Amino acid sequence: MKKLFFSLCLACFVLGTAVAQLKTPEQFLGYKPGDRFTPHHRMVDYFEYVAAQNPNIKLIQYGETNEKRPLILAILSSPENMARLEQIRTDNLKRTGLLSGTPSTQVPINWMSFNVHGNESVGMEAAISTFHTLADPNNAKVQAWLKNQVIILDPAINPDGRDRYSNWYNQKMHTQLQPDLQSMEHNEPWPGGRANHYLFDLNRDWAWQVQVESQQRLKMYQQWMPQLHLDFHEQGIDNPFYMAPAAEPLHEQLTPFQHEFQEIFGRNTAKYFDQMGRFYFTKERFDLLYPSYGDTYPMYNGAIGMTIEQGGGGRAGIGGYNAVGDTVTLSSRIAGHYTAALSAVEMTNAHASRLVTEFERYFKTNSTAPKGTYKSFVIKGESNPAQVAKLLELLDKNGIRYGKGTAKTGLKGYEYQSGKVSVPFSTSDKDIVISAYQPKSVLTQVLFEPNPALHDSITYDITSWAMPYAYGLKAFALDTRLDPSGSYEKPTAAPTKVTGTPVAYLAPWQGTRDAAF
């Protein structure tokens, strides 16, 4: 028994010593954060190293890019929370109504995403520094914060674009700091690192999920449904730091608490920026309207979504002059994002109970009393089958529930094709019915609303995106409740048998899917 006790004590001592001696990014990578850009695979190496040292970290590879780079998440919390991590996750889904049952835990989930634009190059560097601080067992303050939250950290949403930029920059950079923006290292050639392998902007793909990175990430997102999501970006070298609260237009579906928590986060982060003597701005440029961003998509899924914008971008490199002659360094840019990330962790800890309570209230309202103008949407059965199939695929990706209609007459609604209100129509079992009385009510209403309300004439992106228009479908929106009668059987296309030796093909064209024959 004494030998067993001694062995257990020795094992605990060795484990504790290993974690206590956790290497810093500088010790592991061989250079100070901000001295050069880290290749994606070296970031993965560091995350794997830290996760191997700390039992309170779960590292997940949730997918891979077109160029076969791994997409990873790091999940961190206290030992108590990590021991019941799956219960916390499923309890959170119960809160949304996506799973049945009553939750027994009250732990909010704080998700932070970096480098959706590859050449907004500080993102992954800041993620590395943030990860080290969150994983450091000797940081008593942070470890106390982790008792009241689960943190999910995605260090690089767009590894292909990120490496396209960092590989180019590391090849062209001077041996000494060269802040002159006319030098080669400050003039990235086409196509640049902003987009992914197929030159698609992943920051516009949250709702549509056209790209593999988005498809794989959103599958994970739907499994957790966080209370908080921070989306870390960069802007031009002459811009100061942007933090929430956001600018107008602000979508009418946003709740008072979502606005309030943006203010809470902004005030706390501004406090630290004031202490550091750093410039920042709020309530300008970055609005909350278009539904496929890393702030609005979480907002329409019940979270507090926030964009964070550091000044610098790919042009700044590891250091560049701005318009007033100051040198904007990579290390100072890391400090900006690092400060905002830890501010979010601090405020999640301080408001953990309310984040969970308001989140649960949000989804209860969705299912029982949706507040949007339209309560139901009908896609007519005679619509283009290929386009209907694409729409249903999109709804499935976003967890939006739908079903088939029944034979009903005397209905009136907004007709998308004509733009007229109170148009009489009837339904049949060939139609698709999407009710707003469901967990994904807000996202449903936002994606289908024909005319989003605008309170400001200047917006950051497009102002209309209604799905019936996007897919060219005959559809109606009702201001009354209409429930589906059962599951809808998706249209399938039977393969055409080709006989003989064809010299050409003639196929009906109703959508891009008809090219696959």
Region locations from a protein language model:
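Intrinsic-disorder/low-complexity accessory segments
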Residues: 21-121, 125-137, 142-150, 198, ...
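Aromatic- and acidic-residue-enriched carbohydrate-binding clefts of CAZyme catalytic domains
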Residues: 182-200
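Short, conserved secondary-structure transition motifs
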Residues: 149-165
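Aromatic- and acidic-residue-enriched segments that line the glycan-binding/catalytic groove
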Residues: 163-180
